[in-house]
């Protein structure tokens, strides 16, 4: 038989009396560890963010939201060409560069050009009616001196291959 009786007025001390096989009894006393309680008020923890002086992206005034979603992006996913006035030049820089230049630094003004296969017959013989002009030369019908061919220039990179200009 087991008998449990609280014995102390101070807490939950428990005494257990257990009969043994020899006719006696065993008494076991269990005392819980005291809990230390502070009566001081608990502190307040205040979390503060880091100063906002870190580097952050600031878009220039002329950056365009080219996807129409209210976001500005540095990724080239849509090619946007800023509208220009009719009398404004289509070159980004001054007209100092020649279109015949073989230079890699040529300004790509992103205008459509005919490919060399279809319609790119610049400098070749042409046929149309000049009437009887009677001025002693042919109009490119193929007879006479062969015309001097221009040397092909390197193709300029497209908008996806070209690095954006950095304004200082």
Curated annotation (Swiss-Prot):
It holds the Pfam family PPI_Ypi1. Coiled coil: none annotated. GO terms for molecular function: protein phosphatase 1 binding; protein serine/threonine phosphatase inhibitor activity. Belongs to the YPI1 family. It comes from the Eukaryota. Residues 1-25 have a biased composition (Polar residues). This is Type 1 phosphatases regulator YPI1. Residues 47-59, 129-142 have a biased composition (Basic and acidic residues). Regulator of type 1 phosphatases which maintains protein phosphatase activity under strict control. One of its GO terms (cellular component) is nucleus. Residues 1-168 are annotated as: Disordered. The lineage of its organism: Eukaryota, Fungi, Dikarya, Ascomycota, Pezizomycotina. Residues 146-155 have a biased composition (Basic residues). The gene is YPI1. It is found in: Nucleus. Keywords: Nucleus.
